[in-house]
Regions:
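Sec-dependent signal peptide recognition
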Residues: 2-9
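Structural signature of eukaryotic scaffold interfaces centered on beta-propeller domains
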Residues: 143-153
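Short beta-strand->alpha-helix linker/helix-N-cap micro-motif
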Residues: 21-82, 93
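Amphipathic beta-strand/beta-sheet edge segments enriched in Tyr/Trp
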Residues: 18, 52, 76-141
Length: 174
């Protein structure tokens, strides 16, 4: 019986924390030429940065620096695939953001440089004041189209933190 008391009381004093640190991505990442988002609004630059960072953080992609891009095609007809093979790009992404009174629309086209073909060209809609979430959905679509695995940039994590004996329930968007 005494053993049972200790067995029930000891877990109250134990504390464990799980920390996952990603220090390296893929040894052979997909090389992507991300043409900066077209658009007039401030949402355009924000969306470009979010999508770029989401893809980099997966560890599966290498995004070419904007200064190393050799052309800025505005549509499928402007793409010269041999140019993109010169810099060893695997994929080319053309993107745009359209801001209107009814909301925001992001369009993106993914081109496989080796196969010289378009592999996806969807539109994603969202509310004007939530460019971040819309951008995460775009990132997920790009990730899934290239890897075949569902993206996780728009997922949510629920966690409980404790400080000064007060529990706080938090929901975060990643």
């Amino acid at each position: 019986m005494k053993f049972l008391k200790y067995f029930l009381i000891i877990p109250l004093f134990l504390n464990a924390e799980l920390v996952i640190e990603i220090t390296q991505g893929s040894d052979n990442p997909y090389r992507i030429a991300l043409i900066p988002f077209k658009g007039e609004s401030g949402a355009t630059k924000q969306a470009n940065e979010i999508v770029k960072n989401d893809l980099i953080r997966t560890g599966e992609f290498y995004i070419f620096d904007e200064k190393s891009l050799i052309a800025y095609p505005s549509g499928e007809d402007d793409i010269n695939y041999s140019d993109w093979r010169l810099i060893n790009a695997d994929y080319l992404l053309l993107t745009s953001v359209i801001d209107s009174d009814s909301g925001i629309e992001a369009r993106y086209e993914i081109f496989d440089v080796r196969k010289k073909s378009k592999i996806r060209s969807p539109k994603v809609y969202g509310v004007t004041n939530n460019v971040r979430q819309l951008s995460h959905y775009v990132s997920d679509g790009i990730y899934e189209a290239i890897t075949g695995i569902q993206g996780i940039a728009s997922t949510k994590i629920l966690y409980v933190s404790q400080s000064n004996e007060v529990d706080t329930l938090s929901l975060i968007h990643i």
